[in-house]
């Protein structure tokens, strides 16, 4: 039988080598699963299939894993390196696989009794042929027959995945549970349950019968009530209101097609190869673990580009997970993109629900139905794409609906997975710059898509990092324990608004904790720190090295992606990127690297992607630079006064009682790099490296100037309203940006001044009547003034005087007009 089986495998390998191209999940199992190749491995497959076994063998050999067809030689015994859990359907019906498997498990377990150094690693491995879960109306099919497998080989040969799961230590099993035959049987049962969960996590629930789903939604009590109200309000018939409801459901709902997803996989594989030199994915194991545990997963990425929609779904598919249903703006529902996106899982959402109860009720019910059926969901919490490269303030509507779904009695735990997405080049960045200069946003259409496609070329690297998940049930239990109290389905519990804001804010913090530093955003940050946007090559390399050491030795977060390349390699990479704006020039003194004028504004976008990572070191450097000699305690006191504003603006994760330790670590690192002198708790400038200190300090310069503008106005006009404060601050910032050549568009962004005024209120700078507390504001203003150049202070003071002159003139004119009217 063995010779016949070997012959069959050789024959079978011929069509497999021609028709099947499989991909391993994860791509580097030795590293990602922490496998010890010094210890024996046994692979467990879910059911008997020589085809799957040969595909597994091919993948193992390419990944430098032990060959499953070679036996493990242990203590004089020769044991197979693979087992099948179930017999299933197969060409060769030999021994009952299940009993044989239990026997092999027992023999492996028994070997551990008298060999303490032995630790066999049991690795579940499954081969997926296609990823379609089928439709709800279709019958459940168990395993494929021989003929079906041949057809699958032809049809799904390019859609084949080998999934390696976390290894189980048999040494641990024996130590905890013993090594008898009952444990071997239990091991087999646990493995079967694992494979069932794994299959579900890869394929997801069956696709809905769209019309049946529509009917269920329309028949829900909440929508029936909304239809009746619509008819009453608009004075139309119930039937007409119902037709309007059906039209809305059809406008919103996705229409997922697995065949469309397969085509998308081919198209997007071509697209990414054309666009990017590489796609770097981190922490995918976090999501796979949640999926295996049966969590309802909600992906919440930052929003940089329209590419985000496509990229995340593509990567999840290649991580062995189900692509989510994606909340897409209604602006993307144009022909032909709309129907295509809908077939890939997009459901469409209008920009505003205000004044349309029928629409908001239907959308809420549709989202709740997706959760109820077990589909993963994705939405962009910022509401739209960031034009500045910074995270925007979260829009909480979708988050509110997510928490309400939990309140309605969803049985599965919900986990929110924040996702950081970063690019070395964003396709729309030119458009963003125009919009920030005042141009109107161009409506998405087929022509715009074609123009973007023409730009497709080498765009460098792309980064996707799955941040620390937020398990909503646990989060609410910890922070809002009253959430479990029963509520009427149509009521809004008191805890909800605060909980929604809290979870949304934590999402933004976790996204920033997973930021990716790359060659372009780091080199761009250093060049923008120089007032002339140019540095000698040696100085640039030295400063990039300084940042790399800082990020590695004083980590912002364990999730941050820090490049392994040298500063030299990073610079050479950026110089090869098309339209990077980074130029190399030579003169008689050597090589200079500069940023061309037109690209300076665009480069601020990429700097802003990672500004939060270096803003605290930059603030510390700025304090030392302006004081020249300063005590550690004064540095910490100054940082503590400014940090709450930075935390609110940049979604920083350090709690205020952690800031001292972080500042001390930064000071130690600056001293180790000889950027400063650190003796007896006093910090002094090291004149030999003052340029490095200046470049570090520049990262927070414009932020401090913005804060100083607002506080100066507040001290001059303590009774000023928040709206007027924000407006006047923005006007002065615009003038300052022109006179001092500040290229960053966000410098006079009204949203940032709004965030700062809200922070002032939260930090107690206003009394209960909304008036400024002068003493506190004066202290903060003095701290900021000590960190800002005299030239900038004079410009701000001059601008304030101009504003006051204009206001006085306007007052005189209005008074004169009033007198004239009275006399007439």
Swiss-Prot record:
Presence of keyword Membrane: yes
In the bilayer, the protein is annotated as: Peripheral membrane protein
- Catalysed reactions, as listed in the record: sn-glycerol 3-phosphate + an acyl-CoA = a 1-acyl-sn-glycero-3-phosphate + CoA
Residue positions of motif HXXXXD motif? 302-307
Q: Which enzyme class, named as a word?
A: transferase
Major place of localization? Answer: membrane
Q: What is its EC number?
A: 2.3.1.15
| One GO CC term, this protein | plasma membrane
Q: In which pathway does it act?
A: Phospholipid metabolism; CDP-diacylglycerol biosynthesis; CDP-diacylglycerol from sn-glycerol 3-phosphate: step 1/3
Query: Per the UniProt record, which residue ranges are transmembrane?
Result: none
Question: What UniProt keywords are attached to this protein's entry?
Answer: Acyltransferase, Cell inner membrane, Cell membrane, Lipid biosynthesis, Lipid metabolism, Membrane, Phospholipid biosynthesis, Phospholipid metabolism, Transferase
Q: Where in the cell is it found?
A: Cell inner membrane
Pfam families, from UniProt? Acyltransferase (PF01553), GPAT_C (PF19277)
Free-text domain note: The HXXXXD motif is essential for acyltransferase activity and may constitute the binding site for the phosphate moiety of the glycerol-3-phosphate.
Give the UniProt family note. Belongs to the GPAT/DAPAT family.
| Entries under PANTHER family matching the protein | DIHYDROXYACETONE PHOSPHATE ACYLTRANSFERASE, GLYCEROL-3-PHOSPHATE ACYLTRANSFERASE
Q: How is this protein named in the record? A: Glycerol-3-phosphate acyltransferase
């Amino acid at each position: 039988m063995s010779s016949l089986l070997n012959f069959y495998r050789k024959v079978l390998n011929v069509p497999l080598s021609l028709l099947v191209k499989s991909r391993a999940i994860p791509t580097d199992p030795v590293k990602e699963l922490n496998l010890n190749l010094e210890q024996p491995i046994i692979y467990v497959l879910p059911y008997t299939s020589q085809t799957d076994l040969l595909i597994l063998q091919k993948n193992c050999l390419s990944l430098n894993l032990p060959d499953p067809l070679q036996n493990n030689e242990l203590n004089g015994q020769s044991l197979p390196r693979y087992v099948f859990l179930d017999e299933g359907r197969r060409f060769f019906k030999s021994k009952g696989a299940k009993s044989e498997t239990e026997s092999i498990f027992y023999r492996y377990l028994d070997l551990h009794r008298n060999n303490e150094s032995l630790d066999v690693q049991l690795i579940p491995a499954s081969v997926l042929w296609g990823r379609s879960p089928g439709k709800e109306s279709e019958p459940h099919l168990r395993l494929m027959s021989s003929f079906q497998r041949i057809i699958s080989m032809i049809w799904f040969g390019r859609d084949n995945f080998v999934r390696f799961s976390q290894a189980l230590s048999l040494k641990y099993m024996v130590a905890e549970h013993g090594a008898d035959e009952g444990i071997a049987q239990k091991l087999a049962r646990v493995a079967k349950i694992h494979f069932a969960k794994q299959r579900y996590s890869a394929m997801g629930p069956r696709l809905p019968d769209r019309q049946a789903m529509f009917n269920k939604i329309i028949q829900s009590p909440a929508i029936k009530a909304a239809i009746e109200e619509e008819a009453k309000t608009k004075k139309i018939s119930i039937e007409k209101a119902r037709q309007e409801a059906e039209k809305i459901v059809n406008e919103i709902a996705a229409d997922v097609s697995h065949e469309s997803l397969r085509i998308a996989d081919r198209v997007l594989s071509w697209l990414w190869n054309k666009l990017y030199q590489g796609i770097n994915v981190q922490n995918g194991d976090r999501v796979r673990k949640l999926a295996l545990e049966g969590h309802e997963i909600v992906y919440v990425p930052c929003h940089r580009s329209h590419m985000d929609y496509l990229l995340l779904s593509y990567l999840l598919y290649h991580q062995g997970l189900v692509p989510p249903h994606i909340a897409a703006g209604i602006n993307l529902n144009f022909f032909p993109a709309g129907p295509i996106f809908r077939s890939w899982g997009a459901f469409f959402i209008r920009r505003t629900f205000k004044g349309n109860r029928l629409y908001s009720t239907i959308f809420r019910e549709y989202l709740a139905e997706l959760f109820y059926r077990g589909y993963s969901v994705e939405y962009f919490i910022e509401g739209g794409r960031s034009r500045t490269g910074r995270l925007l303030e979260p829009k909480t509507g979708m988050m509110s609906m997510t928490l309400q779904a939990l309140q309605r009695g969803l049985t599965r735990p919900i986990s929110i997975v924040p996702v950081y997405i970063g690019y070395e080049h964003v396709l729309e960045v030119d458009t963003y710059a125009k919009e920030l200069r005042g141009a109107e946003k161009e409506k998405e259409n087929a022509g715009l898509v074609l123009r973007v496609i023409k730009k497709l070329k080498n765009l460098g690297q792309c980064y996707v990092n799955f941040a620390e998940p937020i398990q909503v049930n646990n989060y609410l239990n910890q922070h809002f324990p009253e959430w479990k109290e029963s509520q009427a389905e149509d009521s809004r519990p008191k805890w909800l608004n605060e909980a929604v804001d809290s979870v949304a804010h934590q999402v933004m913090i976790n996204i920033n904790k997973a930021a990716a530093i790359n060659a372009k955003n780091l080199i761009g940050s250093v060049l923008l720190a120089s007032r002339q946007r140019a540095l000698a090559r040696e100085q640039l390399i030295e400063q990039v090295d300084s940042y790399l050491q800082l990020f590695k030795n004083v980590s912002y977060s364990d999730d941050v992606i820090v490049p392994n390349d040298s500063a030299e390699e990073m610079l050479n990479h950026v110089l090869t990127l098309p339209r990077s704006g980074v130029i190399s020039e030579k003169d008689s003194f050597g090589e200079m690297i500069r940023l061309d004028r037109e690209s300076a504004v665009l480069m601020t976008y990429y700097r802003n992607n990672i500004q939060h990572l270096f803003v605290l070191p930059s603030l510390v450097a700025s304090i030392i630079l302006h004081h020249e000699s300063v005590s550690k305690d004064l540095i910490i006191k100054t940082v503590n006064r400014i940090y709450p504003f930075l935390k609110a603006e940049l979604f920083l994760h350090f709690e205020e009682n952690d800031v001292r330790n972080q500042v001390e670590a930064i000071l130690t690192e600056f001293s180790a790099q000889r950027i400063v002198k650190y003796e007896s708790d006093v910090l002094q400038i090291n004149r030999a490296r003052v340029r490095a200190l200046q470049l570090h300090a520049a990262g927070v310069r414009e932020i401090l100037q913005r804060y100083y503008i607002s506080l100066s106005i507040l001290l001059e006009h303590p009774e000023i309203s928040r709206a007027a404060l924000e407006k006047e601050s923005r006007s002065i910032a615009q003038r300052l940006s022109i006179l001092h050549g500040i290229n960053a568009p966000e410098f006079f962004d009204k949203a940032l001044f709004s965030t700062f005024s809200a922070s002032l209120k939260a930090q107690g700078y206003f009394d209960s009547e909304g008036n400024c507390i002068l003493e506190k504001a004066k202290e903060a203003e003095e701290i900021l003034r000590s960190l800002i150049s005299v030239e900038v202070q004079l410009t701000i003071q001059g601008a304030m005087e101009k504003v006051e002159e204009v206001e006085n003139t306007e007052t005189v004119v209005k008074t004169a007009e009033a007198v004239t009217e009275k006399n007439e």
